[in-house]
Amino acid sequence: MSGWKLGLDGFVTHFMVSGPQEEPYFNEAKDKNQLRYEAYLRSVIAEHKPVGETGEILVGAKSRLNEEWKYYYDSGSCFVNISTFYSVMRHIHFDIATVLETSSDIDVTAALWSYAAVDVYCNGRLEGALKQPVYKPIQKKELTLHLKAGRNLIYLACENLGVRDTRSVAGLQILNHKDEIKVSIPDEACADAAAVAEAFLESA
């Protein structure tokens, strides 16, 4: 079985990312308390639309968000982080994809970490979700991934409210069966090139 080992504490560290897709956001609610107002908007913004058919997840190909897929590399970081500052409100969507490889069918306990609302799919099946975004602290939710022998597509559909300093961050931590899992990405050709580039960078 090829692929990368899990990172520190069982975190997945290799991903493909599409987005962010940013759309203007308006809500008629009003509140003089800015933090309370933002908390309310976060409680209602997430739509959790079913992902459906993802299409080919290849570098440069368009995702369901009509944004290109990119390989995400951050030198072993535990999280995908595409945070930025917003001067006007935006509804943010971004998708994350990775592959977990195993030699046998296993049920894996995982922890999803994010400030965003996230739906987690394993081979097209919804396995769990964070229902709404938060400003802080980061959210954590344990869920079960039903892995089949071979390559398993893990797909995170993320939504966030873009307002001021917005934390668009997500991570996936494997809590058991760590020695039985290798990590890859959906674009196998890119995975080979990424492995070579990563080895070069880490040897410098």
Each model region followed by its residue ranges:
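Accessory carbohydrate-binding/adhesion or oligomerization-edge regions at the termini
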Residues: 1-78, 157-204
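Generic structural detector for well-ordered beta-strands
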Residues: 11, 15-17, 99-101, 144-146
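Short structured motifs
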Residues: 80-84, 95-97, 138-142
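Short beta-strands within extracellular/lumenal beta-sheet-rich domains
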Residues: 88-100
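Residues that act as N-cap/strand-start positions at coil-to-secondary-structure junctions
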Residues: 92-94, 104-106, 114, 137-139
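Ser/Thr- (and often Asn-) enriched beta-sheet segments in non-cytosolic proteins
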Residues: 101, 107-109, 142-146, 171-174, ...
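Aromatic-lined ligand-binding clefts that engage carbohydrates, nucleic acids, or primary amines
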Residues: 102, 107-121, 154
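Beta-strand-rich ligand-recognition modules
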Residues: 119-171
